[in-house]
Amino acid sequence: MLKPGDPGGSAFLKVDPAYLQHWQQLFPHGGGGGGPLKASGAALALGAPQPLQPPPPPPPPPPERAEPPPDGLRPRPASLSSTPAPSSTSASSASSCAAAAAAAALAGLSALPVAQMPVFAPLAAAAVAAEPLPPKDLCLGASAGPGPAKCGGGGGSVGDGRGVPRFRCSAEELDYYLYGQQRMEIIPLNQHTSDPNNRCDMCADNRNGECPMHGPLHSLRRLVGTSSAAAAAPPPELPEWLRDLPREVCLCTSTVPGLAYGICAAQRIQQGTWIGPFQGVLLSPEKVQTGVVRNTQHLWEIYDQDGTLQHFIDGGEPSKSSWMRYIRCARHCGEQNLTVVQYRSNIFYRACIDIPRGTELLVWYNDSYTSFFGIPLQCIAQDENLNVPSTVMEAMCRQDALQPFNKSSKLSPSGQQRSVVFPQTPCSRNFSLLDKSGPMEAGFNQINVKNQRVLASPTSTSQLHSEFSDWHLWKCGQCFKTFTQRILLQMHVCTQNPDRPYQCGHCSQSFSQPSELRNHVVTHSSDRPFKCGYCGRAFAGATTLNNHIRTHTGEKPFKCERCERSFTQATQLSRHQRMPNECKPITESPESIEVD
């Protein structure tokens, strides 16, 4: 028997020649202390396993479904097949051979890149995402002791001497899980009770009778379709949230790596289509602050008319939510096709583009998201007389303003640095709640390039990166404390000035009410240069400012000649004269006659 302490010993076991050939095909390079695998008749020499040379990495495989499947759709566990030991081998010999084969398999698995590892490799790559990335490759592995895993030597190293394998992941493979897409497959549910024989596979539509264009396909389907026993079997019981799935959408496997299921369009969805409302459990901000909700993946915020956080809608529990919980969030603006809209106290999804059939629905905020929450982009250029070019390469998109900056720019899909323009700050929050008049329309002020300052150029992006921490974007403007999530910043009570939490993003002034901040932000807007000296409001024209100042002074220069009423504006006088019963002339009283 081979002892663990013998570094170069060998053990000769009687093994069937077919079994030897099987392992030689699996490990063609061999791995014994004295060289490759040796066979003498029916004898096999197994030594200490050596690491194998890693083969060239193929394209990355589809990631493992990290999310558990919904109720009623749990797949069967995958069966593991192994080569059985020959009957002529004794129990002890079989166990020794299995141990040696497992050691060789472990050495070979540790030398393989992530692309050739089993399906659990993407999960291991996601588990060490917080570890600082090496310049080119990322070493993945599990450490026996506490602390993060560290990279070993060169490629193909087994581990740290304790039998723990380590793996290597390139930046391209990590980029796949951040920006790539996996294959999407439609999951048939048969939740509709229409006759399957009348469904056209080419038109993807249910018809009464044969399809006029693809009729012969139905006859063939009935002949070679399901058997009578399978057709007589009742359909599986579907979860409650899947029974309400409309015909316009269907369940599918998500294209976002690491997610199991998603929702795709079963037919073309036109731009402007509303989906909702989003169903879930109402949670107070205090309950979320206590940390009761662990999974915030299906959590939406509801704000009142003043912009104050009112409550949350949690769709994490499938029994109390709907199928909309499986509409995933878009990772970048290129794959977004839905925008989230708050109408009164409900959450709806609105199609921002025409969604073709077979496309997964992905939702995110619209461009007015930063304006609503008062998140101005921090200006780097301090020179007021800065010469601004007449054209701008590309405006900063929503994700650039909200997502943290990565330490390395190699993972960017485009690989190019972009110029950023400081947008105009609106005088009020455009993403506000609606009254009974109609749905919400998220407006956004257009950018005036001549009056704006360029935040960054392709040569000064290092300054922009230094303004923000690597993984902490949400920063308090008074105590400069940073947070990883925006909700944590909203629940933060600043110790520096708790009575005036609303701070201007352009200057150091802070206010106690959001309305005061909105009135103050107008003073920084460049398109309203005429400012009132009484209340501080700014206007775009001098005439509008003069009409406004008369409301403070009480001056009424516009006088009606018939009834002698005075008005502050000429439009008020004109409207007064057009009203038939409003302007009444003053009747002169007759002169009195004195009688002697």
Curated annotation (Swiss-Prot):
Coiled-coil intervals: none
Biological process annotations from GO: methylation; negative regulation of DNA-templated transcription; negative regulation of smooth muscle cell differentiation; negative regulation of transcription by RNA polymerase II; neurogenesis
Enzyme Commission number(s): 2.1.1.361
Keyword terms of this UniProt record: Chromatin regulator, Metal-binding, Methyltransferase, Nucleus, Repeat, Repressor, S-adenosyl-L-methionine, Transcription, Transcription regulation, Transferase, Zinc, Zinc-finger
Residue spans, zinc finger C2H2-type: 474-496, 502-524, 530-552, 558-580
Annotated region (Disordered), positions in chain: 25-92
Impact reported for residue 264 to S: Loss of function in histone modification
Impact after mutating residue 550 to Q: Loss of function in histone modification. Loss of nuclear localization
Regions of compositional bias (Pro residues) in chain numbering: 51-63
Location of the protein in the cell: Nucleus
EC class of the enzyme, as a word: transferase
Pfam families recorded: PRDM2_PR, zf-C2H2
Superkingdom, natural source: Eukaryota
Family matches, as Gene3D superfamilies: Classic Zinc Finger (3.30.160.60), SET domain (2.170.270.10)
Biological role: Putative histone methyltransferase that acts as a transcriptional repressor of smooth muscle gene expression. Promotes the transition from differentiated to proliferative smooth muscle by suppressing differentiation and maintaining the proliferative potential of vascular smooth muscle cells. Also plays a role in endothelial cells by inhibiting endothelial cell proliferation, survival and differentiation. It is unclear whether it has histone methyltransferase activity in vivo.
Family statement: Belongs to the class V-like SAM-binding methyltransferase superfamily.
Complex and partners: Interacts with HDAC1, HDAC2, HDAC3, CBX1 and EP300.
Protein name (Swiss-Prot/TrEMBL): Putative histone-lysine N-methyltransferase PRDM6
Provenance organism: Mus musculus
Gene: Prdm6
